[in-house]
């Protein structure tokens, strides 16, 4: 018994705990150490045990003086003085094992001993402390469960309200459905028309650009050819410049010189003719003079041909330059037209982008609101999950407490059955005792009758 799971209190501590936890009022004030030690008073212990049973089981005082309903006694009036003791023993026999006291006996109430009584009271006080702590914990869990249930109801209501708001946001009102449909149809038609117009203009611009690019490529090719021809002509011109004069003055001077030369040649020719006429007979000199004249004539003819060729080349180069300038102006016009088309296309794209941006912004606002509502719902769901986990833990603890209560009830039922068995044994013993008393009374009555009859006979004999 020394290794039990409750502390052993001394008499002073037991008196203090009994005054604070078990006995109240005048009974607690009148309790002293002499009532418990060294010779415990049975009536004080009966009062303490009854009060402890009232605290733990809720048994009222009058129940100790009542016959149990589930028992049948032939002479209940004979047990009126014995009922409080019997009920107290029965309840203590089931209550003290819960307090880790397993050696309780009936003699501990009839003839209590100080050490055993202090141990029994220590176990009862420890159990009452444990019961109060468990009750506080249970009440705290119960309060948390109620508050969690209220919060869960509030969160469910908020969740339902958020779902209703989300449905209202997702659904278009009846009075705005027609307008919303018209707006959506108008936006779709506008987008389709813009897409078609943009596609057509893009195709036209692409065709015009491709055609103009082909023309530009042809003209560029022609221009490159002309540039090559100009370069070749310039090379020819450079080569001819060595042969001809560069400036008009020089050309004039050269022409004058040539004229002078021609005149000189004419004069020389005249002289030659004169000489020919003079020297007609000079046959040997005539061929050489003719060859020289032919050479000079050939040179003059080459010079005139080169001059005409140079003039034609210059004219052709001027024509090519004019054509290049006209092609460049046409190319500039095409570029300006292309830029205007690009600007128009950019304006159309900007209008389409603004319309699309407004639509996307509206959709984004709706999506953002949906996301906020969904985040709120997720937060509510997370809180609900946390509350649900707390409720499940509380329910598990409640189940554990209920299991402990059920175990206590089972133990109480077993003790009840045990006490009923004891009561039946006492009942049978009492009935046997009553039968013996009746038989003894009958025997004594018979003996008394015999003795009275014998005395009467003796008195009759003495009188006669």
Swiss-Prot record:
Positions bearing N-acetylmethionine: 1
Stretch list, region Interaction with the N-terminus of NDC80: 1-385
InterPro entries noted in UniProt: Kinetochore_Nuf2_N (IPR005549), Nuf2_N_sf (IPR038275)
Coiled coil: 147-345, 389-459
Subcellular localization, as worded in the UniProt entry: Nucleus; Chromosome, Centromere, Kinetochore
Region named Interaction with the C-terminus of NDC80 and the SPBC24-SPBC25 subcomplex: 386-464
UniProt modification remark: Can be phosphorylated by AURKA and AURKB.
GO biological process: one example: attachment of mitotic spindle microtubules to kinetochore
CC annotations in GO: cytosol; kinetochore; membrane; Ndc80 complex; nucleoplasm; outer kinetochore
Entry-annotated residues carrying Phosphoserine: 171, 247
Keywords: Acetylation, Cell cycle, Cell division, Centromere, Chromosome, Coiled coil, Kinetochore, Mitosis, Nucleus, Phosphoprotein
GO MF entry, a single one: microtubule binding
Family the entry assigns: Belongs to the NUF2 family.
Subunit structure: Component of the NDC80 complex, which consists of NDC80/HEC1, CDCA1, SPBC24 and SPBC25. The NDC80 complex is formed by two subcomplexes composed of NDC80/HEC1-CDCA1 and SPBC24-SPBC25. Each subcomplex is formed by parallel interactions through the coiled-coil domains of individual subunits. Formation of a tetrameric complex is mediated by interactions between the C-terminal regions of both subunits of the NDC80/HEC1-CDCA1 subcomplex and the N-terminal regions of both subunits of the SPBC24-SPBC25 complex.
Main function: Acts as a component of the essential kinetochore-associated NDC80 complex, which is required for chromosome segregation and spindle checkpoint activity. Required for kinetochore integrity and the organization of stable microtubule binding sites in the outer plate of the kinetochore. The NDC80 complex synergistically enhances the affinity of the SKA1 complex for microtubules and may allow the NDC80 complex to track depolymerizing microtubules.
Database matches in PANTHER family: KINETOCHORE PROTEIN NUF2 (PTHR21650:SF2), MEMBRALIN/KINETOCHORE PROTEIN NUF2 (PTHR21650)
Protein name from the UniProt record: Kinetochore protein Nuf2
Species the sequence originates in: Homo sapiens (Human)
């Amino acid at each position: 018994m020394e290794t039990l799971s409750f502390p052993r209190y001394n008499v002073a501590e037991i008196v203090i705990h009994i005054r604070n936890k078990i006995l109240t009022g005048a009974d607690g004030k009148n309790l002293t150490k002499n009532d418990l030690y060294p010779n415990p008073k049975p009536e004080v212990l009966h009062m303490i045990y009854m009060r402890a049973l009232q605290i733990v089981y809720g048994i009222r005082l009058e129940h100790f003086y009542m016959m149990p309903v589930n028992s049948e006694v032939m002479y209940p009036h004979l047990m009126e003085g014995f009922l409080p003791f019997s009920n107290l023993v029965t309840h203590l026999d089931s209550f003290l094992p819960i307090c880790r006291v397993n050696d309780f006996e009936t003699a501990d109430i009839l003839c209590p001993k100080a050490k055993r009584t202090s141990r029994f009271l220590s176990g009862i006080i420890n159990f009452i402390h444990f019961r109060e702590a468990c009750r506080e914990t249970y009440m705290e869990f119960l309060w948390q469960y109620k508050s969690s249930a209220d919060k869960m109801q509030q969160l469910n209501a908020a969740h339902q309200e958020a779902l209703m708001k989300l449905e209202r946001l997702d659904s278009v009102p009846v009075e705005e459905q027609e307008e919303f449909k018209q707006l959506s149809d108008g936006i779709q038609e506008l987008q389709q028309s813009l897409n078609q117009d943009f596609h057509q203009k893009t195709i036209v611009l692409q065709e015009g650009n491709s055609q103009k690019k082909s023309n530009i490529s042809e003209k560029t090719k022609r221009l490159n050819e002309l540039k090559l021809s100009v370069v070749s002509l310039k090379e020819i011109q450079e080569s001819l410049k060595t042969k001809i004069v560069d400036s008009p003055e020089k050309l004039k001077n050269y022409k004058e010189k040539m004229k002078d030369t021609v005149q000189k040649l004419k004069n020389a020719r005249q002289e030659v003719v004169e000489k020919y006429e003079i020297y007609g007979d000079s046959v040997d000199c005539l061929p050489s003079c003719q060859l020289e004249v032919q050479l000079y004539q050939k040179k003059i003819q080459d010079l005139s041909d080169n001059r005409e060729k140079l003039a034609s080349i210059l004219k052709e180069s001027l024509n090519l330059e004019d054509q290049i300038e006209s092609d460049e102006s046409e190319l500039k016009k095409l570029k300006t037209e292309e830029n205007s088309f690009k600007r128009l296309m950019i304006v159309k794209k900007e209008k389409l982008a603004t319309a699309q941006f407004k639509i996307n912004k509206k959709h984004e606002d709706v999506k953002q609101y949906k996301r906020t509502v969904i985040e709120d719902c997720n937060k509510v769901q997370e809180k609900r999950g946390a509350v649900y986990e707390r409720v499940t833990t509380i329910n598990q603890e409640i189940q554990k407490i209920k299991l402990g209560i059920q175990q206590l009830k089972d133990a109480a039922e077993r003790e009840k059955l045990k006490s009923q068995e004891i009561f039946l044994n006492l009942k049978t013993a009492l009935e046997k005792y009553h039968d013996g008393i009746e038989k003894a009374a009958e025997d004594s009555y018979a003996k008394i009758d015999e003795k009275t009859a014998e005395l009467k006979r003796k008195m009759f004999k003495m009188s006669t």
